[in-house]
Amino acid sequence: MFCEPKNLVVLRQLSRQASVKVGKTWTGTKKRAQRIFIFILELLLEFCRGEDSVDGKNKSTTALPAVKDSVKDS
């Protein structure tokens, strides 16, 4: 799966490296393109973490709520 922990580390590293390059070397159109790339990387990172981009709250990671055992043995 794309959102495995090792891939999240790679996404963070790419985002940081891209941020440094924007500040030091690129200008004009290239800088704008790289900022878009950084934005996309950060969106992917938020998606993989399960964060909601609208309100910043974490989404529930459980598929179904826990079921209580209502049947008791006699």
From Swiss-Prot:
Query: Which Pfam family name is an example for this entry?
Result: Polyoma_agno
Q: Which subcellular locations apply to this protein?
A: Host cytoplasm; Host nucleus membrane; Host rough endoplasmic reticulum membrane; Host cell membrane
What residue ranges are annotated as transmembrane?
Answer: 36-52
Keywords assigned: Host cell membrane, Host cytoplasm, Host endoplasmic reticulum, Host membrane, Host nucleus, Host-virus interaction, Ion channel, Ion transport, Membrane, Phosphoprotein, Signal-anchor, Transmembrane, Transmembrane helix, Transport, Viral ion channel
Q: Topology in the membrane?
A: Single-pass type II membrane protein
Keyword Ion transport applies: yes
List the stretches on the Cytoplasmic face of the membrane.
1-35
Taxonomy, superkingdom: Viruses
Entry annotated with the keyword Phosphoprotein? yes
Sites bearing Phosphoserine, chain numbering: S15, S19
> In this UniProt entry, which residues form the Extracellular topological domain(s)?
53-74
GO term, biological process aspect, one: monoatomic ion transmembrane transport
Q: Which GO terms describe its molecular function?
A: channel activity; DNA binding
Q: Which GO terms describe its cellular component?
A: host cell nuclear membrane; host cell plasma membrane; host cell rough endoplasmic reticulum membrane; membrane
**Post-translational modification Phosphothreonine, affected residues:** T29
PTM annotation: Phosphorylated by host kinase. Phosphorylation segregates agnoprotein in cytoplasm, whereas unphosphorylated agnoprotein migrate to the nucleus.
User: Which function does this protein serve?
Assistant: Alters the structure of the nuclear envelope by interacting with host CBX5 and disrupting CBX5 association with LBR. Involved in the perinuclear-nuclear localization of the capsid protein VP1 during virion assembly and maturation. Plays an important role in the release of progeny virions from infected cells and in viral propagation, probably by acting as a viral ionic channel in the host plasma membrane. Allows influx of extracellular calcium ions in the host cell. May contribute to viral genome transcription and translation of viral late proteins.
Give the multimer and partner information.
Homooligomer. Interacts with VP1. Interacts with large T antigen; this interaction may impact upon the activity of T-antigen on the control of viral gene transcription and replication. Interacts with small t antigen. Interacts with host CBX5; this interaction induces the dissociation of CBX5 from LBR, resulting in destabilization of the nuclear envelope.
The similarity comment for this entry is: Belongs to the polyomavirus agnoprotein family.
Q: What is this protein called?
A: Agnoprotein
Q: Which organism is it from?
A: BK polyomavirus (strain AS)
